[in-house]
Amino acid sequence: MSYDVIVVGAGHAGIEASLAAAKMGARTLMLTLNLDHIGQMSCNPAIGGIGKGHLVREIDALGGAMGLLIDATGIQFRFLNTRKGPAVRARRAQADKAAYRAESKRVLEHQPNLQIRQASVERLIVENGGVRGVESQIGETFESPTVILTTGTFLKGLVHVGMKNYSAGRAGDFAAMGLSPQLAELGFRIGRLKTGTCPRLDGRTIDYSALEIQPGDEPPPAFSFRTRAIEREQIPCHLTYTNARTHEIIRGAIDRSPIYSGVIQSRGPRYCPSVEDKVMRFRDKERHQIFLEPEGRETVEVYPNGLSTSLPLDVQIAMVRSIKGLERAEIMRPGYAIEYDFSDPTQLAASLETKLVRGLFFAGQLNGTTGYEEAAAQGLIAGINAARAVRGEPAVVLRRDEAYIGVLIDDLVTRGIGGEPYRMFTSRAEYRLLLREDNADRRLSKLGNTLALLDSDAARRVQLKAERVRGEFARLSAVLAPASDATNAILAECGSAPIANPVRAIELLRRPEISYDAIIRILRIAPPAPFQPPNGRDRVGSESKVGTGPANPLNLDEAAELEIEVKYEGYVRRQAEAVERFKRLEETALPEWLDYRGMAGLSTEARERLSAVRPRSLGQAARMPGITPAAVSLIAVHLRGGRNRPPESVMRSLP
């Protein structure tokens, strides 16, 4: 059986990779160990969060599935960081895990050009430096010039609960044992990482009356630009805390922890530590937050977010029951840690194709990342580029100034993961004020439509939104708000100073405390003053006009984007100028054949790192660890000096 693209794995990376390739017309095969576990949420039942929510919005803008899937199956939706700047505001949704799996499978099964099979892939078929397909555990062969590995935690996965451990890709699923040794034989640098998960509690045994309730936002903020509205009833989460007794139980059993007893040597995510890590590392903290998150509408299971652990089951029970509201809680599934193999992502090109085997792509936790969203973003790009490789088209590579997806992949292929699972944060992006959640559609939907991932109707809606925001910006720049009692009463309600003379509406909106809604109220209740500055123009040259508020005011998403553009206009402009400087470095291409080892003036470390990674541009070289500004200057001088032709040996090998 022959295909254009084969995707190994049906987690969040595999879903996006398969759908992208199939939508682009590639005959695609998805292979998974278990057809009933497509889109499984192995850890917390949630999508989004700081940095992660930005990725989901970008995936959606490009035409990916994750945003639509969570909108269709979520049970609670919230905005995070609403009191902070717009660059770090993000959506987060609690998922109904069973519904998310079912919806993922339904979408995949109804996608043209996509076939789904249950099989355990044990070997890659590699010939003449290129992948030719895969072979399953029972000897089936599937042929394809491109293969995308999205293996998650399944490569030689080992689950730990206390001093007990067993082979598994996650609790309840077999590990994949054959691929790792073959990848190592092919020259891939294989390492070992760890992650963990929380015990699942029986919600019927929780005393919710003793806990702090956390409702969702109204109206629920959708992830997808294509979702019109979410009208389902939301389910609240609850908040509780560990205490001195909890910490005493953990410290008393720390010698039975596989992490602290030395059984587990690999490193886990720095920003998602186990509860035993938190207690041992932060001894001055009297308590730690525990968020009780329902796992779905049709189950009683509850996920105690913040209680990830690999302690023995008896210790987990004692620890849980020491917490307020959980005194009688029953554990339905124990928490555990899992070790698994990953591959050094610096052996990948920015397309996510491997440098060692032509046509072979890696995405997700195989590349050392952690999180559903990071995996989905990589899967989408790998699927796009595998389909384009089959057609002989150049790869799609997003820059750091274009998308968080670009930041994620550039970090991986340029810097690697530094020995611990990589998680996306807004702080990783240099131009985060330009890469906001609210403008992801404006940044990326045109590309999604060009790639045939985003339908034309959705692309037109994005264009219409941008036009409405631009139009309202222009209108508010021209309309004058009168210095009336009605205007000043509204300003006073907002805690803002009164005005003595007519003011352009856009200038009022620049005030931090003034919302777009307040501007609309001012323009409707107190119609703009019939005032014309000299020559009929205001001080920045736009025509001043008389009129009331718009017949069709902006909706919540449009208004949010307008407010940010207005209030942060100066900052946005400065970041845009910085991007232009960044582009100049990115546009200075570094030839693949460049001989760094023979480049005079470079340190031994720089020569080794540059030779290993082979950066595609001067900008990428500048971001590599161990590469100093002086080294970047040396490379630039080398290129400018005319020493940018390949040596004779390379010239002779060129066709």
Sequence positions of predicted segments:
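Core beta-strand elements of the Rossmann-like FAD/NAD(P) dinucleotide-binding domain
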Residues: 3, 137-146
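An anion/pyrophosphate-binding glycine-rich loop and adjacent beta-alpha core
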Residues: 34, 181-317, 325, 405, ...
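Conserved beta-strand-loop-beta-strand element in the redox core of flavoprotein oxidoreductases
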Residues: 125-141
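A glycine-rich dinucleotide-binding beta-alpha-beta segment and adjacent secondary-structure elements
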Residues: 303-369, 397-410, 555-609, 614
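Extended, charge-enriched "interface" segments that sit outside catalytic cores
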Residues: 428, 434, 440, 445-450, ...
